[in-house]
Regions:
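A short beta-loop-alpha structural element at the N-terminal edge
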Residues: 4-20, 29, 156-170
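Flexible, substrate/cofactor-facing loop regions flanked by secondary structure
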Residues: 38-39, 147, 151-232
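Acyl-donor-binding surface of acyltransferase catalytic domains
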Residues: 74-154
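Conserved donor-binding loop and adjoining core beta-sheet/short helix segment
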Residues: 7, 11-15, 25-105, 213, ...
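Generic hydrophobic alpha-helical scaffold/packing signal
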Residues: 172, 207, 221-224, 235, ...
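Conserved acyl-CoA
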Residues: 94-109, 242, 251-263
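A structural microfeature
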Residues: 69, 134-135, 219, 249
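Flexible nucleotide-binding loop
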Residues: 246
Length: 263
């Protein structure tokens, strides 16, 4: 007999438990919720874009002490996600009600992020008065196919043992257009990439970095290898403005494909 209890999420105590829960319920189509590296990448980015101030609002459902459901926000804090173990679909109405009543920050409207296959949650959301406002597509590449875009002349792949986290931070600063909007690189948020590098399940060594002839990092593709789910989760991906539309990102993805296929 099930014995369902709820409790609030604790950053210090629960990140590892939630990661394992997401590993255990993972399905390729995300019908049970986001993959584990999605969560860890976000919560390891608290020094930069992820606001964990309100993480106490995140809620965990347990059955005899085992995590079976999780409601949480990412970025922005108004985007609410749901992870639900198969066989516990009856919790969907309670999860939607919890989000509706407790996940709003200072009265802001929330939006529920649901994936195809999360039928029980979708039904509960509609019964609560929610409706589908938009749709996006998350792409996955099957390694049974081939990815083989060439590296443009004048660029090279940086060897993993030579990765420079300071250069990665500068590449991300420029690659996500912060230089245009906030000024030149002055080591802003450099701690963010360090925290990502040392995250519990980070696989920094599998990232792909492309540099120009002067050694400046031109393109960066992060990689969170999750062997338990046979998932190569790429996050982030950026190219600095002066080298865009040259095929660097395609070349980086091709190199990731070659490396991860071997793994």
């Amino acid at each position: 007999m099930k014995n369902i209890t709820t409790r609030q999420f604790s950053v210090l105590a629960d990140c590892g438990k939630i990661y394992q829960f997401m590993l255990d319920i993972y399905e390729r189509d995300w019908k049970n919720g986001v993959p584990a590296p999605f969560f860890e990448y976000a919560f390891s980015s608290f020094a930069y874009w992820m606001d964990i101030t309100y993480s106490y609002k995140n809620c965990i459902w347990e059955d005899h002490g085992e995590i079976v459901a999780f409601c949480f926000y990412e970025a922005p804090v108004t985007d609410i996600y749901f992870s639900l173990k198969p066989g516990y679909e009856e919790l969907a109405p309670a999860m939607i009600s919890y989000a509706d009543e407790h996940m709003s920050i200072k009265g802001e409207n929330i939006q529920l992020i649901l994936f195809g296959g999360q039928d029980a949650l979708m039904k509960a959301a509609m019964e609560k008065g929610y409706y589908q406002a938009s749709e996006t597509i998350d792409m996955q590449f099957d390694f049974e196919e081939m990815l083989n875009y060439p590296l443009p002349e004048g660029f090279h792949f940086v060897k993993p043992e030579e990765y420079d986290i300071d250069k990665v931070s500068k590449c991300c600063w420029k690659g996500f257009d912060h230089e245009q909007n906030e000024g030149p690189w002055e080591h802003q948020y450099e701690q963010s990439n360090y925290l990502l590098k040392v995250a519990p399940h980070a696989t920094w060594e599998h990232a792909v970095i492309i540099a120009d002839e002067k050694g400046e990092y031109a393109c960066y593709a992060g990689m969170w290898w999750t062997p338990q789910n046979k998932l190569a989760y790429m996050e982030p991906l950026c190219t600095i403005p002066e080298y865009r539309n040259m095929g660097l990102a395609s070349a980086a993805l091709s190199e990731l494909y070659r490396r991860m296929k071997k793994g």
